[in-house]
Swiss-Prot record:
Gene that encodes the chain: ntmt1-b
Compartment list: Nucleus
Keywords attached to this entry: Methyltransferase, Nucleus, S-adenosyl-L-methionine, Transferase
Catalysed transformations (reactions): N-terminal L-alanyl-L-prolyl-L-lysyl-[protein] + 3 S-adenosyl-L-methionine = N-terminal N,N,N-trimethyl-L-alanyl-L-prolyl-L-lysyl-[protein] + 3 S-adenosyl-L-homocysteine + 3 H(+); N-terminal L-seryl-L-prolyl-L-lysyl-[protein] + 3 S-adenosyl-L-methionine = N-terminal N,N,N-trimethyl-L-seryl-L-prolyl-L-lysyl-[protein] + 3 S-adenosyl-L-homocysteine + 3 H(+); N-terminal L-prolyl-L-prolyl-L-lysyl-[protein] + 2 S-adenosyl-L-methionine = N-terminal N,N-dimethyl-L-prolyl-L-prolyl-L-lysyl-[protein] + 2 S-adenosyl-L-homocysteine + 2 H(+)
Family per similarity comment: Belongs to the methyltransferase superfamily. NTM1 family.
Catalytic class of the enzyme: transferase
Protein name: N-terminal Xaa-Pro-Lys N-methyltransferase 1-B
SUPFAM superfamilies: S-adenosyl-L-methionine-dependent methyltransferases
GO molecular function, one term: histone methyltransferase activity
Length: 223
């Protein structure tokens, strides 16, 4: 379990919130100085997501998506708005959501709702979303809160809806990052927590062409 790395839950969440308050509301800020990987990231995410949006009896709809840990809307703008009629955004940092309204431009009119909230306290509206996208943010949740959040996300899905997690993982034990107060989980633990939440993994994909110094990034699709 990775929660043993969290000695004080209140401090764990408070420190992360303070960290993000001091991060510039830019793409480079959202990516911790790795803004140059954004195109590679988004292109891979689009290919991964589109396999579920194609024709077929289990096809995922394109009515509404939710961007979790949305920041200024990097993923909303380049990945979700081009594919979905409406996108909702949730982030713990109010300044980022305010910036999103200008960053998203004209297409931002199709953002349905902005939620300023930590994911540990957020409950998606039942049966609203075709896709719930959770990228580079599960490390800011304890194991217990991640499981309960995924359970709430499951209730938020429309028929044939899917939840997608994209995040850094390790292969040999979870690691705490004291700088931003987050946990990089072992990939086996991520799979275990997904199962604990009552979800089934549909596909897993490793991100290619990222800098060597970054922990490996994997995408998980589930319902």
């Amino acid at each position: 379990m990775s929660t043993e790395l969290v000695e004080d839950e209140t401090q764990f969440y408070g420190k992360a919130q303070n960290y993000w308050k001091n991060v510039p509301a830019t793409v480079d800020g959202m990516l911790g100085g790795y803004g140059h990987i954004s195109n590679t990231d988004l292109n891979s995410s689009k290919k991964f997501l589109q396999r579920f949006l194609r024709e077929g009896s289990q096809k995922t709809g394109n009515t509404c998506a939710l961007d979790c840990g949305a920041g200024i809307g990097r993923i909303t703008k380049r990945l979700l708005l081009p594919l979905f009629k409406t996108v909702d955004m949730v982030d713990v940092t109010d300044e980022f959501l305010n910036k999103a309204k200008s960053y998203l431009g004209e297409e931002g009119k199709r953002v349905g709702k902005y939620f300023c909230c930590g994911l540990q306290e957020f409950s998606p509206e039942p049966s609203r979303y075709d896709v719930i996208w959770i990228q580079w943010v599960i490390g800011h949740l304890t194991d217990e809160h991640l499981v309960s959040f995924l359970q709430r996300c499951k209730l938020g899905l429309r028929p044939n809806g899917i939840i997608l997690i994209k995040d850094n993982v390790t292969q040999d034990g979870s690691i705490m990052d004291d700088a931003d107060s987050s946990i990089c989980r072992d990939i086996d633990l991520v799979r275990k927590l997904i199962k604990q939440a009552g979800l089934s993994v549909l596909a897993i994909e490793r991100q290619e062409n990222f800098p060597d110094e970054i922990y490996q990034v994997f995408s998980f699709a589930m319902r």
